[in-house]
Amino acid sequence: MELRLFVGLGNPGLQYTQTRHNAGFLAVDALAKRWQCSWVEKSRFKGYLAEGAGPGGRAILLKPTTYMNHSGQSVRAVADYFRLPPQQLLVLYDEVALPLGKIRLRPEGSAAGHNGIKSLIEHLGTNQFARLRIGIGREPPPPVLTNYVLGKFAPEEQEQLPAILDGCVEAVEAVLAKGLEKAMSIYNARSFGSPPDP
């Protein structure tokens, strides 16, 4: 089976731990735990790399340390080194347009205002790569977006996270085992975690 690269987007540093914008980091951390592989910092790739075996073959996990807006530098370096075309890439990242508990697999698409994805498109020269968008919701009334995404998950949201991250792992493993289209039909309609009581 072909080698696959799974990239989680986020910002490095303790101050960004458990923030909504780091949902991608949290998701690939969950994958690393599931596949029992360890993170190693690789300066040549400007990120943390973990290599393991998922369903269907060998997989590489990546957490860029370039900060969100320059994630494409790290992804391009890894893709070039391992000679991976965009079709063997899946990017996991936060999505304010989806409520907490929802995830969406897509085969391709625009950046839709996400600076991390914008950087990937610029450095890879294409938007033809799969992605898993992880819903982080949006406070009503809409706040300043930057403050919201860089804020930490609220305590009641933290309670939902384990189930949401389990859903991300299941969806990625379904992509590997059954293909993207089948995984989309299963997971794009599901919700994970119980919303807090009103």
Swiss-Prot record:
The active site is at 21 (proton acceptor). It is an enzyme of class 3 (hydrolase). PROSITE patterns: PEPT_TRNA_HYDROL_1, PEPT_TRNA_HYDROL_2. GO terms for cellular component: cytoplasm. It catalyses: an N-acyl-L-alpha-aminoacyl-tRNA + H2O = an N-acyl-L-amino acid + a tRNA + H(+). TRNA binds at residues 16, 67, 69, 115. One of its GO terms (biological process) is protein quality control for misfolded or incompletely synthesized proteins. One of its GO terms (molecular function) is tRNA binding. Its EC number is 3.1.1.29. The record marks 11 as: Discriminates between blocked and unblocked aminoacyl-tRNA. The record marks 94 as: Stabilizes the basic form of H active site to accept a proton. It comes from the Bacteria. Keywords: Cytoplasm, Hydrolase, RNA-binding, tRNA-binding. It is found in: Cytoplasm. Belongs to the PTH family. Hydrolyzes ribosome-free peptidyl-tRNAs (with 1 or more amino acids incorporated), which drop off the ribosome during protein synthesis, or as a result of ribosome stalling. Monomer. This is Peptidyl-tRNA hydrolase. It comes from Gloeobacter violaceus (strain ATCC 29082 / PCC 7421).
